[in-house]
């Protein structure tokens, strides 16, 4: 490595907001199953506090050694609906509290996996877990919840979509932060290190380390050096920058897995913004030549960015996974907030962008008077985009305040302007229930 590369790395960290967004330990809870919910809760607490006892300390040590900030240390677990189904309990709040107590005691930032996978219908534990979500998120500090309502192979469970529209409303009423910790997915992945949608898939090893990186500022600075150049040069520049970012993510993941004595899972190639100036995905798109995100050309710019990040990342690391794309959360990206306030970015344009990028309608505040059927219809639209395009999509939406208000979440969750919603009803559409069948191109065998 020559002196120029050393200088570039120092600049990435000190000036361009590069960091490791998260190291997330995935832990299987399948061996914690018990017919008694209190015994199951005790087993869950014991396993998490044993396996992840040193996660925070190891993360801090690696950050100090490498001089690279590791912003979050997190845990993801087996979807709790699977564990709860073995009990006769009618509420899974005790399991949520066990997760929360374990997370608090080991010092991690969040714990994900209060989750259910219902893309093709409800099993015993699924409905109970979903109905438990509002109070589970209201009565815990660090628990995150997710529900997968669709997949390319299964179609969309519209009964679950309707239920989740109602649950999001109830969750937002039950607590200030609850809805920000709840994600509704289509094509959810089993190795996602990012919250609030992380859970540990049943096909995963017993315990693994997954890493999520963050580098929008690094990409923007690289693009500043090629202003006026062709799209070919633009794509190559993003690709090379993503390579550097991912290499560091892989190094951190390998060091953490070795020191913790668990397997190394994946590096998630996502570009994750923060509310800080200089750490915005929106500003990367604007650096490509857009006056403001949301104008015509935004989707094309996002497509170039997303693809080039994947190509560079795959070259840098042979174990990539998770969501792996550009995140466009409104409240967590100062450029997105500015675009909404400037009238350039609306829900419909964000929805179009989700056909390309990672995840979907993320950290968006809408008026609290929005009917649950309208929220369900938003979920259905996002799920349809994911199911048809064979990609992960999601909705993390917060019904609070009235149009034009600013809702402050604090920390990495930022501040969201309350965005207008189409006033026309989707009630009769959502009331149908049942299943939207899988698309014809899902039949691969």
Swiss-Prot record:
Superkingdom field:
Bacteria
Q: Which cysteines are joined by disulfide bonds?
A: none
UniProt-listed SUPFAM superfamilies: PFL-like glycyl radical enzymes
Query: Which residues span the membrane?
Result: none
Q: How does it assemble?
A: Homodimer.
Q: Which family does it belong to?
A: Belongs to the UPF0210 family.
* Name assigned to this protein: UPF0210 protein SZO_15840
């Amino acid at each position: 490595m020559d002196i120029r590369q050393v200088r570039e790395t120092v600049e990435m960290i000190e000036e361009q907001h590069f960091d490791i967004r998260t190291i997330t330990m995935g832990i299987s809870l399948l061996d914690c199953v018990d017919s008694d919910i209190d015994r199951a809760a005790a087993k869950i607490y014991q396993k998490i506090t044993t396996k992840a006892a040193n996660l925070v300390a190891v993360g801090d040590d690696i950050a100090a050694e490498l001089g690279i900030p590791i912003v979050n240390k997190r845990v993801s677990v087996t979807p709790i609906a699977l564990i709860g189904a073995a009990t006769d309990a009618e509420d899974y709040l005790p399991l949520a509290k066990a997760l929360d107590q374990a997370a608090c005691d080991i010092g991690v930032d969040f714990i994900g996996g209060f989750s259910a996978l219902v893309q093709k219908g409800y099993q015993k534990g699924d409905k109970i877990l979903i109905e438990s979500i509002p109070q589970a998120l209201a009565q815990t500090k660090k628990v995150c919840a997710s529900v997968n309502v669709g997949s390319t192979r299964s179609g969309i469970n519209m009964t679950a979509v309707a239920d989740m529209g109602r649950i999001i409303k109830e969750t937002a009423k039950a607590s200030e932060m609850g809805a920000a910790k709840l994600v509704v997915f289509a094509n959810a992945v089993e190795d996602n290190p990012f919250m609030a949608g992380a859970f540990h898939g049943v096909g995963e090893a017993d315990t693994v380390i997954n890493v999520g990186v963050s580098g929008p500022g690094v990409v923007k600075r690289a693009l500043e050096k090629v202003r006026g150049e062709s799209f070919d040069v633009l794509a190559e520049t993003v690709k090379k920058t993503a390579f550097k970012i991912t290499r560091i993510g892989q190094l951190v993941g390998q060091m953490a897995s070795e020191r913790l004595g668990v397997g190394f899972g994946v590096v998630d190639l996502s570009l994750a913004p923060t509310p800080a100036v200089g750490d915005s995905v929106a500003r990367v798109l604007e650096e490509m030549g857009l006056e403001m995100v949301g104008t015509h050309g935004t989707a094309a710019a996002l497509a170039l960015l997303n693809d080039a990040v994947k190509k560079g990342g795959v070259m840098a690391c042979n174990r990539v996974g998770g969501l792996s794309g550009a995140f466009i959360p409104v409240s967590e990206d100062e450029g997105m907030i500015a675009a909404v306030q400037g009238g350039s970015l609306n829900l419909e344009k964000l929805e179009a962008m989700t056909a390309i990028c990672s995840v979907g309608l993320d950290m968006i505040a809408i008026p609290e008077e929005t009917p649950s059927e309208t929220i369900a219809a938003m979920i259905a639209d996002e799920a349809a985009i994911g199911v048809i395009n064979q990609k992960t999509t999601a909705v993390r939406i917060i019904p609070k305040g009235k149009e034009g208000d600013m809702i402050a979440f604090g920390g990495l969750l930022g501040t969201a302007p309350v965005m207008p919603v189409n006033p026309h009803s989707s009630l009769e559409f959502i009331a149908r229930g049942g299943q939207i069948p899988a698309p014809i191109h899902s039949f691969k065998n």
